[in-house]
Curated annotation (Swiss-Prot):
Name of the protein in question: Uncharacterized protein YHL026C
Topological relation to the membrane, as annotated: Multi-pass membrane protein
Transmembrane segment boundaries: 18-38, 202-222, 244-264
PANTHER family for the chain: FUNGAL PROTEIN
The keyword Transmembrane helix is annotated on this UniProt entry: yes
Renumbered residue ranges of the record's region Disordered: 288-315
Location relative to the cell: Membrane
Additional comment: Present with 830 molecules/cell in log phase SD medium.
Sorted UniProt keywords: Membrane, Transmembrane, Transmembrane helix
Gene Ontology cellular component terms for the protein in this record: cell periphery; membrane
Amino acid sequence: MKSSEPAPATPTGFRNSIWFIIFYLFVIQALGSAIISGGIEFAIAYAMYHSRVDLITLWAFPHTISGDCALSLFIQVGLTWASEEILVGFDDYKRPVFRLNKWITKPSPLKTESNEEIPPPKKRFIVDYFESKDNVVAKQNTLYHKHNWLFGYLEVNRGIIPKGKEATLKGFLTSQFIHDSTQSKFMNFIEWFVQKFIRSMILAIAMFIVIWPVTMGILAGIGHKVGSHDYYFNDYPLPQVMKLIYAVVIAFVCTPVAIIVIVLRNQFHEELYYEGLANGTLQQDQEVCSTGNRSSGSTDQDISTTKQQSQEAVA
């Protein structure tokens, strides 16, 4: 492939600035998620704890706030992850919401034919876990398998190339849920559900290790001591307000992380897709995935069409 052929589409200008990315992650998405999650948790806590005869305690059953907080965290992270996969995933399918190209994009393989030296990225946060020191495109397969834990978590082989004006909800849902055309739609959905559940729970466990103990410490400090090691609370308003704040904190952590995973998945998938074209071969799993999607009529039927759609998506 010649270097004059199209490369992966890259958002430029304001939509690719760090200020837009921060605004999008924490104001547009995380704040909205926090309002919804906080409202739901407040309502649930009101129904659970208001006017209860038994003491509302930190540890003891039947009304244990510690258990409630633990369960709520895992449920909220799982639901947030799934909803962002659909909502943000569809937005990114129509047009990349943003790309982290300035900080973690691999050097384009299309530049390797020139005599210009490829400068290393200024920021190497994720690149260090993704790229080899010399950035040789020929080692693409080696990189893929050597760092498969990152690709595995991001599900890079399930990334979706933006379609621009050609994007449809049906096409997105097919690309999102149908990964193996030889299996039924139900089995494909079960696989999708399991994959998202595993990844969301990995994030939830990491959050639980930090957020839950801190929350329990705060509640122990403001609760009324009962017995040797427990604390009780009034039925209103502390449990309800606490669950609201708890849900807001979770939303501001898990929502940006889920979105970044989606964006990185699509970004890396698109880069590897075009690198495969540049080298005359695609990754095996990407090729199988692409073949399967073609069978379902959801994605690329022609390489040039795909490139044009990808370019139009950010035009």
